[in-house]
From Swiss-Prot:
The keyword Protein biosynthesis applies. Keywords: Elongation factor, Protein biosynthesis. It comes from Oryza sativa subsp. japonica (Rice). GO terms for cellular component: cytosol; eukaryotic translation elongation factor 1 complex. This is Elongation factor 1-beta. One of its GO terms (biological process) is translational elongation. Belongs to the EF-1-beta/EF-1-delta family. The keyword Protein biosynthesis applies. EF-1-beta and EF-1-beta' stimulate the exchange of GDP bound to EF-1-alpha to GTP. GO terms for molecular function: guanyl-nucleotide exchange factor activity; translation elongation factor activity. The lineage of its organism: Eukaryota, Viridiplantae, Streptophyta, Embryophyta, Tracheophyta.
Length: 224
């Protein structure tokens, strides 16, 4: 039976997570899974000392993410000074999460069938000698200047950036405190055509979009 967590940015929400993780290493099962990634994305920062189980779990998932995605972070802000390498705020709505499950598949339990299928695909590509450009799924946090920023116009400005190889996906406004919300948005890129660093530095944080956008953080970057 599926477990539901709500308001993980609040003490009550973290209390429910703390109770669920009592005696457990992961949210479900004996290995890290999509369930852990979805819940991790909904926790704004590392839980405090009053939530030892949740804090331990948070560090475990953060370490797994860091090893999966090595390299220098791009403008990542860590509220609360936690030890984790990066933390998403609230996850997209459940419906969007289900619809975009493939995009958010940062981890998955790889079976023998999966490995065999992957080997067969690789062999097929090699034999046909077709060169296909890879794709990546990216999760961005887009932060406004203040609580007076029109978030609808901010999202419109972000989505106005169009280029070959870039596809915008699901999005959600996430509370970050003091009445301020940030935009959390998915995008898919063709690796040979789009650089996320250039997208942020040359488009999303430049005029005229920087009228609404203060900064952008890469929350997750996953090869498809």
């Amino acid at each position: 039976m599926a477990v539901t967590f709500t308001d993980l940015h609040t003490a009550d929400g973290l209390k429910a997570l703390e109770q669920h993780l009592s005696g457990k290493t992961y949210v479900s099962g004996n290995a890290i899974s999509k369930d852990d990634i979805k819940v991790f994305a909904a926790v704004p920062s590392k839980p405090g000392a009053e939530f030892p189980n949740a804090a331990r779990w948070y560090d475990t998932v953060a370490a797994a993410l860091a090893s999966r995605f090595p390299g220098k972070a791009v403008g990542v802000n860590l509220p609360g000074g936690g030890a984790a390498s990066s933390a998403a705020a609230a996850a997209p709505a459940a419906k969007d999460a289900d619809e975009d499950d493939d995009d958010l598949d940062l981890f998955g339990d790889e079976t023998e069938e999966d490995k065999k299928a992957a080997d067969e695909r690789a062999a097929s590509k090699a034999s046909s000698k077709k060169k296909e450009s890879g794709k990546s799924s990216v999760l961005l946090d887009v932060k406004p200047w203040d609580d007076e920023t029109d978030m609808k116009k901010l999202e419109e400005a972000v989505r106005s950036v169009q280029m070959e190889g870039l596809t915008w996906g699901a999005s959600k406004l996430v509370p970050v405190g003091y009445g301020i919300k940030k935009l959390q948005i998915m995008l898919t890129i063709v690796d040979d055509l789009v650089s996320v660093d250039s997208l942020i530095e040359e488009h999303l944080t430049e005029e005229p979009i920087n009228e609404f956008v203060q900064s952008c953080d890469i929350v997750a970057f996953n090869k498809i």
